[in-house]
Structures are given as C-alpha cells and as structure tokens.
Amino acid sequence: MTNPSPHFFKTFEWPSKAAGLELQNEIEQFYYREAQLLDHRAYEAWFALLDKDIHYFMPLRTNRMIREGELEYSGDQDLAHFDETHETMYGRIRKVTSDVGWAENPPSRTRHLVSNVIVKETATPDTFEVNSAFILYRNRLERQVDIFAGERRDVLRRADNNLGFSIAKRTILLDASTLLSNNLSMFF
C-alpha cells in the first residue's frame, strides 16, 4: 500500500482569515442548491456543475493504531470507493437515470445535509478550497435505511452557470470504516 496523499488524513488547514460574508454565503447557497438537485434526482443538472477535469474521490478508511494514523485512508494509487473522472461520472449518471440500473430502480429517496462550511481562498483567482461536513440519509424500498456522515474537501471554481460555481475536485472522507449499505449508487 502506498502512502496516502497528506490531505486525506491531516486536519483541514484553517485559512489565515475567514472568508468575507458575501463569499461565505455564496458558497453555502451553492451547496444547499447542489443538495437540492441531488435530493430531487436532478442528476443531469447536478452533472453540469462538475468541471471537465473533475476528480471525485472517496478513499477507503481503515482502523489504525495512533502511530499509524497516516495510513487510515487509502492513497491516490490504492483502491477507493470512488475514483471518478468526468467521463466515469457521466456513466454513473446515465446508469442511475435508466431503467436498467437495478441498484436504483426503484430509486432511493435521499436527504443531503451540509454544514460547517469553511472557505479558503487560494493563490489562483476565483478558486477556493472548501471543507464541509455532511450527512446523507437514504431510504430505499420499504425498510432499507442508510446514513453516511463525513467531510468533503472540495475545490470550487467560479463558473458562468446559474449557481455561480463548479466543482473541480471532491474528496469524500467517510466517518465509518465499514459500510453496511447494499451499494454506493448515490452521490455525495
């Protein structure tokens, strides 16, 4: 197993100063609208928010002793729950919106909650590193319930779309090391 990229296991670095209220509000509103798109199964509209160079990544998490903390998450070159590009995300969207994607037929009912949004401006104009906490509730069929909690580390760019931003990178760090869900057909 290769060593993971340092940003997977280190605490998100707080910006030296808080983002301005207007920028903070814009980004939080972006996340609320993004959650609404996903919860209303508007997957094609959500897909339009992804940059062409998107990297959508959810590493595996394992239980480690304190001295092995840097190995808690799988690395860039290791197995992952998701390691997606724009093209593979498009394939996932096509699958969940078709009649042949059995994992989502009938479709799940989801609720995305996003909070603790921390915005960090970068040296690149109109590009922001954003850390947020999430809870994703999913109900499927009659009794299947899944609850996922964790944090997302995103790179957002200002964009000429109706929400004002696009997602250039998303790293999803789940709090759980063992997933009891039947599948991971939803989007975080």
UniProtKB/Swiss-Prot annotation:
UniProt entry tagged with the keyword Oxidoreductase: yes
Catalytic activity: biphenyl + NADH + O2 + H(+) = (2R,3S)-3-phenylcyclohexa-3,5-diene-1,2-diol + NAD(+)
Record-level GO BP terms: 3-phenylpropionate catabolic process
E.C. no: 1.14.12.18
NCBIfam families, alphabetized: PRK10069.1
Stated role: The beta subunit may be responsible for the substrate specificity of the enzyme.
Subunit: Heterohexamer consisting of three BphA subunits and three BphE subunits. A ferredoxin (BphF) and a ferredoxin reductase (BphG) must be present to obtain activity.
Protein name (Swiss-Prot/TrEMBL): Biphenyl dioxygenase subunit beta
UniProt organism field: Paraburkholderia xenovorans (strain LB400)
